[in-house]
């Protein structure tokens, strides 16, 4: 209840800004770039493709740490593929939960950021995060069919950022902590997945996050 109350208090501190002067700064450039690089998760991704059920989604050139374990080596090929699906689903579930957290933070910033440019940028980023939530959820639901709950450590981190009263630290928390960590994980999975749909999906998400 305390966490919920603190989060709702953010909306009591929304900041109107009646100065609509457009400053030619980095935030304005990021907003313009976001408009130029817009994409539609429903039509720009090849959802008709489904990775073969007898092939792994993730198979890097180098051996993954768990592949050296005797317990893993004792699995049948079918069990290894099932392990791959669960392992990928767990990772992508955390992506999904993290992007929902980023969506909530960005929407808060659109309300409480003090400048006109910052509000526009936060609004555009809110749409980016909504799109990421959409495509990660659709891939998990339609292509893997497995979903994992949020990691408690990730939930704690998101709660800290969501309930902080300071808009500037909220902005830093989203850009450096949430998005910074996510970008590295997205790039890693993009590099090692054998699923062209997942690779295409991550290409667009990484492009958004790297702006």
Model-derived segments and spans:
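Single conserved hydrophobic/aromatic residue that forms the stacking wall/gate
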Residues: 1-7, 11
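Conserved alpha-helical segments that form or flank metal/cofactor-binding pockets of metalloenzymes
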Residues: 27-29, 33-64, 126-149
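Alpha-helical scaffold segments that form or flank carboxylate-/histidine-based iron centers
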Residues: 85-95, 114-131, 167-171, 196-210
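Alpha-helical transition-metal enzyme core signature, strongest for iron centers
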Residues: 95-103, 125-140, 172-186, 205-210
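Long, hydrophobic, well-ordered secondary-structure blocks that form the structural core
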Residues: 102-163
